[in-house]
Amino acid sequence: MEELQDDYEDMMEENLEQEEYEDPDIPESQMEEPAAHDTEATATDYHTTSHPGTHKVYVELQELVMDEKNQELRWMEAARWVQLEENLGENGAWGRPHLSHLTFWSLLELRRVFTKGTVLLDLQETSLAGVANQLLDRFIFEDQIRPQDREELLRALLLKHSHAGELEALGGVKPAVLTRSGDPSQPLLPQHSSLETQLFCEQGDGGTEGHSPSGILEKIPPDSEATLVLVGRADFLEQPVLGFVRLQEAAELEAVELPVPIRFLFVLLGPEAPHIDYTQLGRAAATLMSERVFRIDAYMAQSRGELLHSLEGFLDCSLVLPPTDAPSEQALLSLVPVQRELLRRRYQSSPAKPDSSFYKGLDLNGGPDDPLQQTGQLFGGLVRDIRRRYPYYLSDITDAFSPQVLAAVIFIYFAALSPAITFGGLLGEKTRNQMGVSELLISTAVQGILFALLGAQPLLVVGFSGPLLVFEEAFFSFCETNGLEYIVGRVWIGFWLILLVVLVVAFEGSFLVRFISRYTQEIFSFLISLIFIYETFSKLIKIFQDHPLQKTYNYNVLMVPKPQGPLPNTALLSLVLMAGTFFFAMMLRKFKNSSYFPGKLRRVIGDFGVPISILIMVLVDFFIQDTYTQKLSVPDGFKVSNSSARGWVIHPLGLRSEFPIWMMFASALPALLVFILIFLESQITTLIVSKPERKMVKGSGFHLDLLLVVGMGGVAALFGMPWLSATTVRSVTHANALTVMGKASTPGAAAQIQEVKEQRISGLLVAVLVGLSILMEPILSRIPLAVLFGIFLYMGVTSLSGIQLFDRILLLFKPPKYHPDVPYVKRVKTWRMHLFTGIQIICLAVLWVVKSTPASLALPFVLILTVPLRRVLLPLIFRNVELQCLDADDAKATFDEEEGRDEYDEVAMPV
C-alpha cells in the first residue's frame, strides 16, 4: 500500500510542474495556449498573473502541546510546507515530502469556521504580542470569544515556540488542552485518531532525517515569506474561533523555525467537539496557503468575501475519494488525468482556445531567434548561424574550465568509443574489411575535432550509426552485383554529397525538418532496431552453421588465416559471450536508475555499462584458452583495415579498373539517399538537444552544422573513411553530462537546471582520445565478434525504449481494461488507435521488404515518403485531436535519474 501511495504521489507531483500548466506566477503571455480538447475554464476568474506584492510562501503548522520533561505548555512544530508537505515524526525526523491529503470534513469545517472567522488585512504590527492583542480585541468585538477569555488566550498565543531540533531535549511532547486555570487536561487529539492522522504522522522509510534549518533554508527562494498556522484546544471556549491575519509588511516574529519573515497568521482554537480534529483543520489551512492560486488571492484580497471566493474555488478543484478499497494500483493512478483537468480549470483565466502547438511544426515564420526562420537570401540561414553562434567562441573555451567538463570527457569518450568499435567491426564484416575499425576510429576523430572547432552546436557528438551501416551494406551489395569498385563509388557519392549540401544550405532547406513528425521518426527507429536484432541472430546462426554441434570433431584443423573446419564449443561460447554482453549491459542500464547504492555510484556504474560489459566478457573469453572465437580485425597502428585492397587515398577514376562514367553521374542517386539519412539524424538530433527546457543560451545552427557534417563526410570518402552524422543518444548524453542542476529546489520536487556548460573542449578532447584509441590494437584485437553482436542486440532493444509505436503494438495484445492512462489511449477510440498502429506497421513492412530486396539502396527514399503520407493522407482518416495524441512529440528531456527512464526514452531515433 505504501508503494501504491508513493507512485500516486509521484504522478500527482508531476502534474504540478510549471511546464505543464499555466502557473499563476508566470505572466500569461509566456504560457502556451491550452489544448483544443480541454474543457473550458469555469466562470470563476482566478488571478493568473503574478502581482508585484506576492511572494513564495513557507508554511509552518504548530500545535499546542506539553513537553514531557518540564511539563510546560508550548507551541510545537508539527508540519511544514515548501510546495510539498513534510510531517514531523515522533522520533524528531522529518517524513518524506509528499502531496497533501485532506479529509473531506476538514475542508467543509474549514469553510464553515472561515465564514464566521475574523479577518484582519494589512495589519501594521511588527511583533507577535501586538498581533495577538489586536486579534483578540477583534475576537471580542465580533463576539467570537468572551472578554474573560482574553487573558487566557493571550497567554496561550505568547507561549514559547519549539521546533524539530528541540524535540529530543524536551523528552518528547504530548497533545494538551488549554483550560481556564492553565492546567493541561485531555489530549488535543481524539483518543481514537483517524487512519488519516496516523498516516501523516508516521515517519516513512524515505524520511529526510537530519534536515537542518540551514539545509531546508537553501531550498526556499530568497524573497519568500512565511505563514504560521497555530492550532489547539481550549475547553473554556464556547465555539471554534478562526483568525486570519495578513500583515502589511512581513515581520521577523521569531515564531517559525527558519529566519523567514512572517506575512500571514492562522489561529484555530476551540473546544472539543465530536467531529472536529483541530490538527486536520490546521493541515487544511496550511495546505490552502501553500496552494498557488489561493496564495496570490490571499496577498491581493481586500475583504473576507474575496478570500471565501478563492476558498470556494479551491474546493471546486479538490478531489474526494469514496471510502472504498482501490482494486489495483492502476485504479488509483487513473486519478491523475482527472486532477490534471481540474488544475487546467483552476489555472486558466479564459475559455480554452485551439491548441497551436500541434501546428508549430508548420510555422515557417518563427521568431527572430528561430534558427530555422527563412531569410529569403542565398546562404542567409548560414550567415545567421555564424553571426549568432561565433561571437560566443571565446566563452566556448573559457567555460570549459570546470571539473564537470573533465568528468563529461571521460564518460563521453567511452560512450563514443564503444559504438565506434562495434560498428567498425560490423562494417568490416559487411564490406570485407574495405572499411573497418581503424577507418571508423580515424574518421570519428578527425571529423569530431573539426566539428568541435567549427560547429554551431558543439555538444552534438558526430559518429557512425545504424542507418548508415544499413546503407553501406546495401551499396556494397549493389557494387558487388554490378562489378563496381565499392570504395571508388563512395568517392563519387562524396562529391555529390558536397554539391547537394551546398544547394540545400544555400536555399535554407533545413526548415524541412519541421515537417518530419514523430510518425516518421518512430518508423525509422523501429526499422533500425529490427535490423539490429535480426542481424545479431543472423550472425549467431552463421556461427552455428560454421561450427555445428556434433559428437566428434577433427582436431587437426588448419587455423590460418581462419579455421578450415568446425571447432568444438565455438558456437556455444559465442552464444554465451553474446548473451552475457547483452544481459550485463541491460542490467547495468537498469541499475543506473534503481534505488541501490548512492546516486553518484549508480550513475558511474550505469554510464559505463557498455564498456564494463565488454570488459567482463572479453575477460571470460581470455581465460577460456582452449576454445576458438573469431576476434575483431584491427590493423597494427595507423594502417587501413585491408592494405591489399586499398590505401589511404582513393583514386576517383578507379583502383584496379576504370570506373564507369555513367556511374559517376548515377552516384547522385545514392548520394541523395545518404543525404536523406544524415539530414534526418543530424537535424532531429539538433532539435532534441536544443529543446527550450534544456535552457541553453548560446543557440544552435542547423544550416552550419549540416554543411559541416555532410561536407566532412564527402571529403572523408576520398580517403576511404566513413561519413558520419550527429548521433542522437550520444548527443543527448553529452548534453546531460554537461548540465548543472541547481541545489535550491523544493524538497521532494524535481531539480531545476542551473546552467549548461556550452563549450567546445569536451567534444574536442573526446575526438582526440577516440583517435588515439587506434593505438590500442593489442587490446582491441582480443575482442570477440560475439561480444560486439551482444552490443548490437543491446542497441536494438534499447532503441525500442520511448517508441510509442512499440508501446501501441503491445497494446494490440492487451484487453482495453489494462491499457494505460495516456492521451493516445484515453482520447482516441481503441479501434482507431489500432488503425493508426496498423498503418505504421504496414509502412514498416514495406520498408523491410525494400531492405530485403536488391532495391535496398532505395530505403531512405521510401522512408521519406512517409512524410507526405502523414501530412496529406492521415488527416483525411483521423481527426485533428486524434493526431495530436497519436503523433505528439511529448517526450520530456531527461536530466535526473528516474526509475525505468534514461536518454533512450527521450529520443525516438535509432542509435
From Swiss-Prot:
Site location (Important for anion transport) = K590
Glycosylation site list? N642
A matching Pfam family: HCO3_cotransp
Places the protein is found: Cell membrane; Basolateral cell membrane
Activity regulation remarks: Phenyl isothiocyanate inhibits anion transport in vitro.
Region annotation ((Microbial infection) 5ABC region) ranges: 720-761
Reaction catalysis annotation: hydrogencarbonate(in) + chloride(out) = hydrogencarbonate(out) + chloride(in)
PTM note: Phosphorylated on Tyr-8 and Tyr-21 most likely by SYK. PP1-resistant phosphorylation that precedes Tyr-359 and Tyr-904 phosphorylation. Phosphorylated on Tyr-359 and Tyr-904 most likely by LYN. PP1-inhibited phosphorylation that follows Tyr-8 and Tyr-21 phosphorylation.
Write down the InterPro entries for this protein, in alphabetical order.
Anion_exchange, Anion_exchange_1, Anion_exchange_CS, Band3_cytoplasmic_dom, HCO3_transpt-like_TM_dom, HCO3_transpt_euk, PTrfase/Anion_transptr
> Which consequence is recorded for altering P854L?
In Di(a)/Memphis-II antigen
Q: On the Cytoplasmic side, which residues? A: 1-403, 457-459, 507-518, 592-602, 685-700, 738-760, 801-838, 870-911
Q: What is this protein called?
A: Band 3 anion transport protein
- Give the encoding gene's name: SLC4A1
